[in-house]
Every structure is written in structure tokens, then in C-alpha cells.
Amino acid sequence: MDETRNKPPASQTPASHPPASAITEWTDTYFKRTKEAVGKFGDKKVTYAIFMRRPVVCAPRLAIEWLEAVARERGFDLDIVLNYPEGKWVGAGEPILYITGSFYHLVDTETIILQKLGPACVGAYNAFTMCADLPKTAFLAMEARHCAGTEMEEMMAYAASVGSDRAKRKVGAKGFIGNATDATAHFFGQKKGMGTMPHALIGYAGSTVRAAEMFHETFPELPLTVLVDYFGREVTDALEVCRRFPGLAAQGKLAVRLDTPGGRFLEGLDPPGSYAVLERHAPHSIRGYRDETQLRYLIGTGVSAAAIHFMREKLDEAGFPAVKIVASSGFGPAKCRLMAEANAPVDIIGTGSYLPERWTETYATADIIEYDGEKRVKVGREFLFRK
């Protein structure tokens, strides 16, 4: 098999579905019929060009690994030229990679290749912008519950790692330091997933402090991150937990997680109070025009920039400056950008909101540009020819 150029490093758990033997069940029927026709009239060596209609960050590893596995199983030679290494910015319409090989063996793989390439590239783009906008904030990938099955979960965890690595290289960002599940932890250099407690544990315990005690007694070796919004007393419960664990608080091994729902303000805040908080800490963020969504991120209900600043104020005033703040709840690219503008003092963000918001933007497209070395492509796609 020909050596793949600019090939990204192999993943430890490639998305192997479907195996070559099952491709016919999952590919578009017109590809299967084309394969039969090619089998009848003779094979040709073809070159595919694959591109996307929007800027992305190149995240091709899962698609390439799958196609290479198919080539090995079917026993045909495959040459892949990756025009943009993993983690590289790719402009709209630019061929991401060229795939050359037997038309007969490649034709029915197109459906699955596009599935594995497009969404990962958009997810990587989103993860990159989020990490780059908040370079001093660490991120945890919590996409698993938002995914349509384990294959998508793997794809999106991989995407987050690619975008994160780009942000680390470009701006020195902390980026994604881990994720929620064991199966995909390797993408972030971890052996296990990360996480502490859901709201369910607090409901079970009957109080925020008791839930923290239960967790710490069960996992005394782990840093303690405590959800503080269950009873609507974010500030009160956060300070109670800090007083219960003063040693952890002083050592920086205690964090409070804000996950206040969008139906109410964090304890102690309202619209005027939220404006006042940002006036103290980031007045520039509320001086210009803002639409309703931006205002919600800055001074609205839920986990706003004002809420994070307010919690930091209260922790510092009570003598707990080393206690970290973890934020979650809808932290996608737009919200992260506003957090950066407001200088929100958030230490860690747990999010799965780097997942593509508009699925139509994840559609990758493939066209054959050469048949037995002869350039030929449908009119309008000449820009795909090799330069």
C-alpha cells in the first residue's frame, strides 16, 4: 500500500463502523449500482477530491483510518494525499485531501468517508475558537450525552482534541484537559474520564454539603468539585462547602461548579445587580450594542459573566481566593467569546457545545477529478484539480 502523505497520528480506538463487509448496507444505493456497472465494464484508477463549503480545522484521522482498514480488508492499493495536516485551518472550497485507488473498491465508500470527515472538522473548528478566545481557561469535553450514539461521541471527542491542540500551538491556550468518558479519554492524553457529581447526588444526599462529604469520603484522593445550584443558593452553599473543607479550599483542591438554569438568576443577582457587577469588573463589555442573546450571556439568567464575577467576589471576600470556579451550561463559541470580552474569571468550563450547531455546515463533498490519469470533473468543480 502506498505511504499516506501528511498522515495524522493513529488513534487508539478508530471509528471502525461499518466494516468492509457491511458497507453495502450503509452506503447510498446509487454507489452500489455504480460499482456493479464498473465491475461489468472495467475498473479505472480514480482520484477523489474532498472539500467543505465553510472554513474548518482539518480533522481527518477517523475517516482515513477507516478507509485504510477497508483497503486492507478488500486488498487494494490506496494513496491518500492530505493537503492540510491534522489541526490545520482549511478555507472554504479547498480540497482537504485527495484519495487515489480502484474506482470499483472506492465508489461505495464515499458515503461513510463524508460522514466521518465533515462533522469532525466543524467540531474541531468550534473547539479551537473557544479555547483560543479563553486561553487561560481549561476545558472539559462533556459532549457524550448530546451525541447520537457512541460513534458520534468518539468523533466529537476527537474533534475537541484536534481543535484544542491547535489552540495550544497558536496562542498557548490550556485547551481541553480531559473529557467525561473513559472510552475517549485517550484523545486528551488521559487514561480515564473526568467528573465529580451530578445534581442527582445532591438530591440523594439531601444537601450540597452532605453530597460533598459523601464524594470526598468515597474518593479522598481526588480534587473536589461541588455543584452549588441545586437549591438555588449558589453563594450560600458554596461558602458552606468551603468552610466544611478549609484545607482543600486553601490548597486549591476545591472548586464550585455553576450550572444555574436559564429560568432564574444566580443567588443574589437580578438585572440591576448584574449590570453593577460588570460595571465593576468589565465596564467595556456593556458599553456597546448587544443583541438579546449577548445580553443574556453577559447579565442575564443562568450562568452569565456577571454570575461568575459575582461568585468570585463572594469567595474572595470570605477568604477563599484559591477556590476555583467551574462553569457549565451552553458554553459554545458565541458564549465563550462574550466571556472573554467580559474577563470572566472562570477556571474551567465543562461543555459539549462545540458540537456543530447547524448540521448542514458539516456536509463534506467528494468529486472524482481524474480517471486513469485524465483530468475530468463536472463543470463548476474545476477548482478541485491539483494545482
What are these regions (language model features)?
Residues 2-32, 40-42, 58-59, 70-74, ...:
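Gly/Ser/Thr/Ala-enriched C-terminal appendages of enzymes
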Residues 44-50, 78, 138, 222-224, ...:
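Structural beta-strand/beta-sheet cores of well-ordered domains, especially the beta-sheet scaffolds
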Residues 11-14, 88-90, 97-314, 318:
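Buried, small/hydrophobic-residue-enriched core segments of structured protein domains
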Residues 2-107, 111-120, 124:
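Flexible, solvent-exposed loop/hinge segments and secondary-structure transition points
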Residues 79-82, 127-132, 172, 258, ...:
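Short C-terminal domain-edge/linker segments immediately following a structured domain
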Residues 51, 81, 140-143, 227, ...:
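Residues in well-ordered beta-strands of folded domains
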Residues 83, 99, 227-228, 325-329:
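Active-site-adjacent beta-strand anchor residues
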